[in-house]
A protein has these predicted regions:
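A conserved FAD-binding loop/helix module that cradles the flavin
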Residues: 295-329, 393, 407-408
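FAD-site-proximal beta/loop scaffold in flavoenzymes
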Residues: 116, 138-148, 251-302, 385-386
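Surface beta-strand/loop "capping" patches
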Residues: 328-348, 366, 397-455
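Beta1-alpha1 glycine-rich phosphate/pyrophosphate-binding loop at the start
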Residues: 5-67, 71, 146, 155-199, ...
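Predominantly flavin-linked oxidoreductase catalytic cores and closely associated redox partners
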Residues: 106-107, 116-209, 218-220, 298-301
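Short, aromatic- and glycine-rich surface loops/edge beta-strands on solvent-exposed regions
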Residues: 461, 491-509
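FAD-binding core/adjacent interface of flavoenzyme oxidoreductases
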Residues: 1-8, 66-158, 234-242, 253, ...
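A Rossmann-like FAD-binding core segment of flavoenzymes
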Residues: 67, 72-99, 176-263, 343-361, ...
Length: 509
């Protein structure tokens, strides 16, 4: 099986990326989804609050997903559901995906470009090292959400929730609405990990207490959870003796973090961020692996699905551009016109259009010819092999780009490019996405998304170019649970021809 663009994941990121790629001109797209239906995690998120940025109206999770699913179906984009991707490989510039499903067994899919949109998973109890037995009644918040919203089953009636991530906060409200008693939400950090609006709507409105700097130190019960012991923690996250509190319950829900599903990415050797546990990407969402893009929660955990869709659309469009640059679904005339768009003078534009017209006529003539010339095929094959050899030799890494000029007898031309600019996190910033910006590839503006490391009030969001402060914007409050963003405008980058480093940092008043 072959495809120009393979998208791994049929959730909100994968669907948005597929639509963006199709709109950008990619006809050959294949979406691979391990679940039996498209939509990803949105199918179990029956609460509202989705779509305010994308559709300018408030939707539930399934409604938001259905709008994208319908567009994908109308666009005729093929999707393989109930299909698990188990391996990614690359040989001689070709990417190979190994997947399996019940109908076809083992599948090998050759793709020219890949978009990773596998989402994330919840951190399990085993990662917490909580003392006690392993009784029934301990669930991740996402599992409990699926049981209640999809399968119609109640995990328990007396509930304690550990962790104040958005899923945990939403499940506190959901369990209460279903008749359960939620005793408390305990959070080991001195601040909540979820959105402020979820704290208000899911806890405050229902009288559910939030205990900060508190964790579960013991789970009681052998066959079924009978209760938990909570304790305060110090600044090193160690339980403080004498602060223990026993709460009887039959269910413990864990909302203690999300981990991007990046086993495939790591096995392929992509450069990874130790903070987000996702791949490092440039302004086009391209990883360190050429032609492999990433978006959504597989890249870094988002709090709003609208931002996932925006990021995925960027990845889809960038993948389409990458395919065009690498000779897929693009004619010789298109290449000449594309080069003309980069020329500044009107004379250059007119000459290129004339050349493009000639190239288009020649292509039409060649298509009507019954027989092809073997020597021309050999010439194109050797040229492609030489281009691939140049790519492997690291030519593109040192800032040079190959272009073909059919009007000049297909002479080799080299266009100098500026070196990629490193984007780094400064004071109180945990990470930045993207981590590189290529000025020649950046659009009118590039969004840098990041999270802070603590709750900060009346601070300034600052952006510096090689240590020089460029912008300083006051923020009334910054919190780790809410993603922030800074805008880098291309017009500003043009003023700094030798720029090597952009730093995003937070300053006090």
């Amino acid at each position: 099986m072959e495809t120009a663009l393979a998208i791994i994941g049929g959730g909100p990121a994968g669907l948005a990326a597929a639509l963006a790629a199709r709109k950008a001109g990619v006809e050959d797209i294949l979406v691979l989804e391990r679940d039996t239906v498209l939509g990803g995690i949105l199918n179990q998120c029956i609460h509202n609050g989705f779509g305010l940025h994308t559709f300018k109206e408030e939707l539930t999770g399934p409604e938001y997903a259905y709008r994208f699913i319908r567009q994908v179906e109308e666009a005729g984009i093929p999707c393989l559901t109930d299909t698990m991707v188990v391996d990614l490989e690359e040989e001689e510039g070709e990417k190979y995906i190994t997947a399996m499903n019940r109908k076809d067994g083992i599948l090998t899919i050759r793709a020219k470009a890949i978009i990773l949109a596998m989402g994330c998973r919840e951190r399990p109890r085993g990662a917490l090292n909580i003392p006690g037995f392993r009784p029934a009644g301990v669930y991740s918040a996402g599992t409990a959400q699926r049981l209640v919203n999809i399968e119609g089953k109640m995990p328990g009636r007396d509930v304690v929730i550990l962790g104040s991530g958005d899923i945990g906060l939403i499940m506190a409200r959901r369990m209460t609405l279903e008749g359960a008693k939620v005793h408390t939400v305990a959070e080991i950090m001195p601040y909540s990990g979820g959105l402020k609006r979820n704290i208000v709507q899911c806890l405050d409105d229902f009288g559910i207490p939030l205990k900060l700097s508190t964790t579960v130190v013991k789970i009681h019960g052998k066959e079924r959870v009978e209760g938990v012991t909570l304790a305060k923690v110090d600044e090193r996250m160690k339980p403080i003796p004498g602060t223990e509190e026993y709460i009887p319950c039959d269910t413990l829900l864990l909302s203690v973090g999300l981990l991007p599903e990046n086993e495939l990415t790591e096995e392929r050797g992509a450069k990874m961020s130790p903070v987000t546990r996702g791949p490092l990407v440039n302004e086009s969402m391209e990883t360190s692996l050429s032609g492999v893009f990433a978006c959504g929660n597989v890249l870094h955990v988002h709090d709003l699905v609208d931002f996932v869709s925006q990021e995925a659309a960027l990845a889809g469009k960038a993948a389409a551009e990458w395919l065009k640059e690498n000779g897929d679904n693009i004619t010789e005339a298109d290449l000449v016109l594309e080069q003309a768009e980069k020329q500044e003078t009107a004379a250059g534009r007119m000459q290129a259009e004339k050349t493009a017209s000639t190239a288009a006529d020649r292509e039409l003539s060649e298509k009507t010819t019954e027989s092809s010339k073997p020597e021309e095929k050999e010439s194109h094959a050797s040229h492609a092999a030489a281009q691939e050899q140049q790519k492997h030799a690291g030519v593109t890494d040192v800032g040079l780009e190959y272009q073909e000029d059919s009007a000049a007898g297909k002479e080799d031309m080299w266009q100098e490019k500026r070196t990629a600019i490193t984007v780094e996190s400064g004071a109180h910033v945990r990470y930045t996405v993207p981590s590189k910006i290529r000025p020649d590839k950046a659009g009118e503006e590039t969004l840098i998304r990041f999270r802070v490391d603590n709750v900060l009030k009346d601070h300034y969001l600052c952006v510096s170019y090689d240590g020089e402060l460029i912008s300083r914007k006051k923020k009334r409050i910054l919190a780790p649970g809410e993603m922030e963003q800074a805008v880098i405008r291309h017009s500003d980058l043009e003023k700094y021809s030798n720029l090597s480093r952009i730093t995003v940092h937070i300053e006090a008043e």
